[in-house]
Amino acid sequence: MRLSTVDLQKRLNPDKPKGLHMGLTVLIAWLAGAAFILALAPYGIWPVALVSPAILYALLVPAMTGRRAFLIGQAYGTGLWCVGAFWLYTSIHVYGDTPAWLALIMIALMGLGMGLFHGFLALIFNRVVGKQPLSFAALWILQEWMKTWLFTGFPWLFVGYAFTEQYWLSSLAPVAGVFAVSFVAVLLAASIVELLRRRGGYIIPSIALLIISSTLWLINPQWTKPKGTPDLSVSLIQGNIPQDLKWLTEYQIETLKIYATLTRDEWGRDIVLWPESSIPMFQTEAVGFISEMVAMAKETDTTWVTGIPYKDEAAFDASTDKYPPFYNSVVALGAQAEGLYKKQRLVPFGEYIPFQGVLDILPNLAGSQDIMSYSRGSDQQSPLRVRGHNLGAAICYEVAYPDTTRKNAIGTDFLLTISNDAWFGTSAGPLQHLQMVQMRALENGRWFMRATNTGVTAIIDHKGRIVERAPQFERTVLRGDIQARVGNTPFMRFGQYPILFIMTLLLILSYLGKRTKAPVRLVK
């Protein structure tokens, strides 16, 4: 049988694109990334978490130059971050007193920077590995993982979070963490594209993994079990202190009065929990107030847990020109309580200055980081001791780090997180933050108490379900009961290492497979 020139070209280069204009392709990629926010809280339209990466996959499958692939991935990532993390605009413009135009530029630059992760994903997918769903999903997971540590990390907007309450898929979280959930979702999305291209064989791994996750959901294995002690009554205090007043010296006493008043009727509960930095001064400056609260807690047999800036009680050392370190911390006080936890994962530019050594080169800024920055707590800290239980803690932003929370959860009976999301106003940021706490509860099989300044204050069970929830932007108290649990989920035992090993192996196999294939033409 003789083949025409056209038929021969199709066989040699079956993936040659039909000819979408580059500008239109980039726009579609940007919109696909921007739309992903609809999959997360507060919108919760989880199918978008399949459609969004599916569009990126479909745009990248045709043969093309590395430059074209990178621009498509970069556009997707930029749209994802400019829209998905637009809540940063509130903190930059409203509370940072940055002009609106400059705040928008800063958001755009942040989007371009974070978009590089998807840009390089697309480049590697185009040039290094075979173009098929397994390699695409594996690259996706590795770029999500890199966001937990590269350049201090910004682990937000993971695909897996869209499925937090879709237990037919999030049942994988206690086994291998949020990355496993992301992997199956992205693999399914890419496989559906291949199914539409009449390459149905690619859907088989997705179906197999969905059968596993659905089976786990149906049989409902109890990775952890109740400790066998009575549930603890807890009161979570939401002070609703305006962010523009919170750190004013003249408002500090008023803040303390607000929290003391809200707590007045809660003494006698097992645990009273105050939010992050609810005492807006160092412990050395609030000795009298703290003593009064501790006395009341002991008198009523209540454990009082509060966020507070903690300063080592050393004086300024003139010989070294160093100030004593200070920490964003949470402390357990009162009846049957002891322990201090110092935040490990600090917010870049908000709590510390990254790359501090560079400042020492500049004469006018040398040593200034000692005054401006919180210090990082050790990654080897003991749990808080509360009423005969071990209590693991995570402060604000660090609950977004799966491995940090996992390590803090080992050997504990339940968990707490305290936060101040007033920085982000009525945006989606606080609700995305809450969704991540739900995933951490599910991964570790532990109940979570979450106390915040303006919301969302909540109690979450070991399956990631919100049991009690306070309204946002109200001065209120959330009451409920929490259960102590023991045992370790597979994720707690092994962490993210198994899933990362599997992803790396898939990429190595895909790379080796690509090398055996004949080259195809590249389209600019």
Spans of features found by a protein language model:
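Soluble catalytic domains of enzymes that build or remodel membrane lipids, polysaccharides, and related
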Residues: 221-498
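Membrane-embedded alpha-helical bundles of multi-pass enzymes
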Residues: 2-223, 426, 437-440, 452-460, ...
